Structure formats: C-alpha cells, structure tokens
A protein has these predicted regions:
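A late C-terminal transmembrane helix in Major Facilitator Superfamily
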Residues: 329-364, 371
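Helix-loop-helix hairpin linking two adjacent transmembrane segments in secondary transporters
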Residues: 143-191
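C-terminal transmembrane helical hairpin of 12-TM major facilitator-type secondary transporters
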Residues: 276-322
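Cytoplasmic helix-loop-helix junction between adjacent transmembrane helices
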Residues: 113-147
Length: 404
C-alpha cells in the first residue's frame, strides 16, 4: 500500500514516523492495562464478588493466558495479514468480553470471559509491540513505551480503586474504543526488502545482531521466566501486605507512587546504555530476585516500600533491555510480536504457581521465594546468550587476524 511506503512525517522508515510510534505506544499501554493493575483488580474481585485469594489468582492468571494466546495470533499474522484489520478485530473482541463481565459474574463465567478479553488485548498489544520493534532504534522506542507505562500505570492504580468493578470494565472498553479512532497511523504491513536494507544502514552496530533464530527464542524463554517472577509478586503483593496487618491507607497510595518509579527505570536504562544490553540486565534480574525474596522474612511498612519502589524501577529497566534485544535480533517482527505472549504466559503461570502455594497452606513467604527464583533462571539464560555471542565475536576476530 502506497500510504505505508511513503512517510509524510519526514522519517526515511515508516515505522520511525512519530505518529506510528505514538499510536503503537498508546495501543500497547491500553493492552497492558490489566497487567499493570493486577493488585488493584485482585482486591476489587475480593471486595465486589467475594472471590477467595486463590480464585483471584486464577481469574487474572486466565486473563494473562488469553493475552498470551492473542499475542501468538498476532505473531503468526503480522507478516501476512493487514495489521489494521488485526488490531480492529482484537479491539472488538476485548470490548465484547469486558462488557459481558458486567453481567456474568459467577466464577466459571468470569474465568472464560477474562480469557476471552485477554485474547483480544493480546492481539492488538502484540501488533503494537511488533511495530515498535520494527523501528530503527528499538531502545528509544521501547523507552518511550515504558515512560508512558510509568504514567499510565500510576494513573490507573490511582483511579481504579475509586471505581466500581463495572466502572473499571467501562474504562477498559472506552480506552480500547479510542484506539480505533487512530488506526490509520498504524502501518498495514512490515518493511519490504529495500526498506530493510536502508534500515540496516541506519541502525546501531555495537553488537552483531545477525544471530541464529534460536537465540531470540531463548530470549523469549528468559522473558517468560522474568514475568513468572513479576506475575506472582505483583498479583499478591497487596493481599500479602494486608494479610501481614499493613494498613490499606499505606498500601494503596504506595502502589500508586511506586508506579512512578517506572520513570526512574527508563532514565536508568538511558544512562546505562553505554554498558551494552547484557550487563545492566544481569544486575537488574539479580536485584529483582533479592527484592522479592526479602519479603519472605515478613512484610513491614519499610521493606514493603523499598521492595515496591525498587521493583517497579527494575521492571521497566529490564523490559527496555529485553525488548530492545528482541527488536535487534528479529527485524521481521514475527518473534518480537511474541513478547506480549510470553509476558502474558509468565503472568499466567506466576499467579497460578502462587495460588497453588497459598492454596496448599505454604503461605506468602514460600510464594515470594519461589517467585524471586524465577528472575535468577532468566539471568542464567541471558548469561548463556551473552557467552555465545561474545565467544563467536572472539573467534571471528581471531579468524580475521589470521587471514590478515
């Protein structure tokens, strides 16, 4: 389509147009709304529908499973299907499921409806992430996304406790509907070969990102483990704090203010870019494991604040590096579009593991230890990728020296 090959915004690559990036960021933020507000949504289900803590974990875990499935659909389709049609289909599906949640409130129905709503969100979020990954500078694009994430998460965490459960559903429906108004800002197809060659001339060359397809797949596995950690921690942090006797008047504002630390994570990512993508990521994942695990010894006002504030900063910090790494390794966008899928799958597995631990009477302490250990698994996987890439670079340099 000719409107996708030319760019009136002045950028040589259509994916670098400010309108494309702005819309993709907004689309992704709408899709991630449930993921970033799970603590508040969990409490809303307990108070409004009298669901148990275990049921809450399974309901929102099902939403994230649907989110994962939707992103897989996007990944299989973004290279061949008109992306605008794909996004519109996801928006309609998500809006319909959220609307039905207001009328079908029993546990079994809620499980299926949250799964369906997740599918719709996953489809348009996966397409948005693939679009950001297709920019010439994915680090900048994902930093913009996560800067927006810090403000949208703070706003939603502040607003949602003031709304009824149906009010939250109306908010999700309305924000998805707004996305449809700007659909023409989204390129309908990926770059052609000529555009890819131009983009290759413009992109960062600090690493050799021409890697076997298995490496971005390993990256996706690592992202999944990172989000198993996030899912277990973030779903139950508010309920665990309340169970320990922490005042709701302390916990709720803390969640809101902690979300602004996502901004700090983005700024740190910019500062640390000089150290490459791998080393800062290792530090972030190790720190996340410690911050989650330390709550296993008991929750106080002080360690809750430290854990939440630092965790939110490191969440976005790690996401910038994980997403950018995928963007450089996979220019087609098919694997990048799977990022929301593995994030959602991790957010499905994490709450369900946590729910099983709590359901078996092992308590929140064991849950925090298990969740924190998942970040260490991700760190080991990235360590293997780093070792392969830099061993390959050393072998290549040695070969060039001998040839000379």
């Amino acid at each position: 389509m000719t409107d996708d090959t030319t760019n009136s915004g002045g950028a040589p690559i259509v994916f670098d147009d400010w309108r494309t990036i702005s819309f993709a960021v907004f689309l992704a933020l709408v899709g991630y709304s449930v993921m970033v507000t799970v603590p508040v949504l969990s409490t809303a289900l307990v108070h409004s529908l009298s669901f148990s803590a275990e049921q809450v974990g399974r309901v929102w875990g099902n939403d994230m499973l649907g989110f994962s499935v939707g992103a897989i659909i996007a990944a299989l389709s973004v290279a061949s299907v008109n992306r605008r049609h794909l996004v519109l289909g996801g928006i309609v599906f998500s809006m319909g499921a959220n609307a039905l949640c207001m009328y079908m409130v029993d546990y079994e129905s809620m499980m299926w409806l949250r799964f369906a709503a997740g599918i719709g969100s996953g489809i348009f979020t996966g397409t948005a992430v693939a679009t950001l990954g297709g920019t010439t500078n994915p680090v900048r694009a994902f930093n913009i996304l996560l800067l927006g994430f810090s403000f949208s998460a703070a706003g939603e965490l502040h607003l949602f406790p003031q709304l009824s459960l149906n009010g939250i559903y109306w908010f999700l429906i309305g924000s998805a509907a707004v996305c449809g108004l700007f659909i023409r800002w989204l390129p309908s197809r990926p770059l052609n070969q000529e555009e890819k060659e131009l983009q290759h001339e413009l992109e960062d060359r600090s690493e050799d990102w021409n890697v076997p397809v298995i490496l971005p797949i390993f990256c996706l596995v690592a992202v999944c483990f990172t989000y198993i950690n996030i899912g277990g921690y973030f779903t139950y942090i508010e309920l665990a704090a309340l169970d320990e006797g922490i005042s709701p008047d302390w916990v709720t504002p803390l969640l809101t203010w902690a979300s602004f630390l996502a901004l700090v994570g983005c700024l740190l990512a910019l500062v640390c870019a000089r150290f490459g993508l791998f080393r800062p990521l290792f530090v972030a994942l190790l720190s996340m494991a410690v911050l989650v695990g330390m709550l296993s010894g008991g929750i106080t006002n002080v360690n809750l604040a430290i854990s939440l504030f630092a965790f939110m900063a490191l969440w976005t910090f790690a996401d910038v590096y994980q997403s950018s790494m995928m963007g450089y390794m996979d220019r087609s966008g098919s694997l990048v579009a799977l990022l929301p899928s593995v994030q959602g799958f991790g957010q499905f597995v994490g709450p369900n593991i946590a729910a099983s631990i709590i359901g078996n009477g092992l308590g929140y302490s064991i849950m925090f230890l298990v969740s924190g250990s998942m970040a260490l698994v991700a760190m080991v996987i990235y360590g293997g990728i780093f070792f392969y890439m830099h061993t390959r670079k050393s072998v290549s340099l040695t070969g060039d020296t001998e040839a000379a």
